[in-house]
Amino acid sequence: MLWVLVGAVLPVMLLAAPPPINKLALFPDKSAWCEAKNITQIVGHSGCEAKSIQNRACLGQCFSYSVPNTFPQSTESLVHCDSCMPAQSMWEIVTLECPGHEEVPRVDKLVEKIVHCSCQACGKEPSHEGLNVYVQGEDSPGSQPGPHSHAHPHPGGQTPEPEEPPGAPQVEEEGAED
């Protein structure tokens, strides 16, 4: 039984990302830093009026390094990469008005709102756990359902456009500015 437990847990421990590095021996006077900076983000969608919202962006300097390899390889490759990225975020629905579109007079966009940033392993996938807990409507919390894709009429004739799931690239975004 113990071997089964060790056999199941050991691979997970080996694949876990290493902890972020705050100092390097080669540069003892330098420290990694990462923080959330306030920005104004422009949320847009084709055929709709863009909306400015207050958000945060992650900005910082985290350590990465790569030590030259040898062939044949005698030890593991020494490569490490940390990046300044969201450590805590929530999702908010931003409703865009689409004048002249009677079938779809408004579009709901799901926008990630960054709360806190930190240096994390570069390959780490962002976590979307608790998405339903953190989704809040722009006008009044709980009064609007989130974007979803199925065909049925909505109150006021509103039919949300199908959205990509969180984490999918948002090609329609017009970007962020300071």
From Swiss-Prot:
<dbReference type="GO" id="GO:0016015">
    <property type="term" value="F:morphogen activity"/>
</dbReference>
<dbReference type="GO" id="GO:0030514">
    <property type="term" value="P:negative regulation of BMP signaling pathway"/>
</dbReference>
<dbReference type="GO" id="GO:0042802">
    <property type="term" value="F:identical protein binding"/>
</dbReference>
<dbReference type="GO" id="GO:0045666">
    <property type="term" value="P:positive regulation of neuron differentiation"/>
</dbReference>
<dbReference type="InterPro" id="IPR029034">
    <property type="entry name" value="Cystine-knot_cytokine"/>
</dbReference>
<feature type="signal peptide">
    <location>
        <begin position="1"/>
        <end position="16"/>
    </location>
</feature>
<dbReference type="InterPro" id="IPR004133">
    <property type="entry name" value="DAN"/>
</dbReference>
<feature type="region of interest" description="Disordered">
    <location>
        <begin position="132"/>
        <end position="178"/>
    </location>
</feature>
<comment type="similarity">
    <text>Belongs to the DAN family.</text>
</comment>
<dbReference type="InterPro" id="IPR016728">
    <property type="entry name" value="Neuroblast_suppress_tumour_1"/>
</dbReference>
<keyword id="KW-0732">Signal</keyword>
<feature type="disulfide bond">
    <location>
        <begin position="48"/>
        <end position="98"/>
    </location>
</feature>
<feature type="compositionally biased region" description="Low complexity">
    <location>
        <begin position="140"/>
        <end position="160"/>
    </location>
</feature>
<protein>
    <recommendedName>
        <fullName>Neuroblastoma suppressor of tumorigenicity 1</fullName>
    </recommendedName>
</protein>
<keyword id="KW-1015">Disulfide bond</keyword>
<dbReference type="GO" id="GO:0038098">
    <property type="term" value="P:sequestering of BMP from receptor via BMP binding"/>
</dbReference>
<dbReference type="InterPro" id="IPR006207">
    <property type="entry name" value="Cys_knot_C"/>
</dbReference>
<dbReference type="GO" id="GO:0030182">
    <property type="term" value="P:neuron differentiation"/>
</dbReference>
<feature type="disulfide bond">
    <location>
        <begin position="62"/>
        <end position="119"/>
    </location>
</feature>
<dbReference type="Pfam" id="PF03045">
    <property type="entry name" value="DAN"/>
</dbReference>
<dbReference type="GO" id="GO:0035582">
    <property type="term" value="P:sequestering of BMP in extracellular matrix"/>
</dbReference>
<feature type="disulfide bond">
    <location>
        <begin position="81"/>
        <end position="122"/>
    </location>
</feature>
<keyword id="KW-0964">Secreted</keyword>
<dbReference type="GO" id="GO:0005615">
    <property type="term" value="C:extracellular space"/>
</dbReference>
<feature type="domain" description="CTCK">
    <location>
        <begin position="34"/>
        <end position="123"/>
    </location>
</feature>
<comment type="function">
    <text>Possible candidate as a tumor suppressor gene of neuroblastoma. May play an important role in preventing cells from entering the final stage (G1/S) of the transformation process.</text>
</comment>
<feature type="disulfide bond">
    <location>
        <begin position="34"/>
        <end position="84"/>
    </location>
</feature>
<keyword id="KW-0043">Tumor suppressor</keyword>
<dbReference type="GO" id="GO:0007399">
    <property type="term" value="P:nervous system development"/>
</dbReference>
<dbReference type="GO" id="GO:0048812">
    <property type="term" value="P:neuron projection morphogenesis"/>
</dbReference>
<dbReference type="GO" id="GO:0048263">
    <property type="term" value="P:determination of dorsal identity"/>
</dbReference>
<dbReference type="GO" id="GO:0036122">
    <property type="term" value="F:BMP binding"/>
</dbReference>
<comment type="subunit">
    <text>Homodimer.</text>
</comment>
<dbReference type="GO" id="GO:0090027">
    <property type="term" value="P:negative regulation of monocyte chemotaxis"/>
</dbReference>
<feature type="disulfide bond">
    <location>
        <begin position="58"/>
        <end position="117"/>
    </location>
</feature>
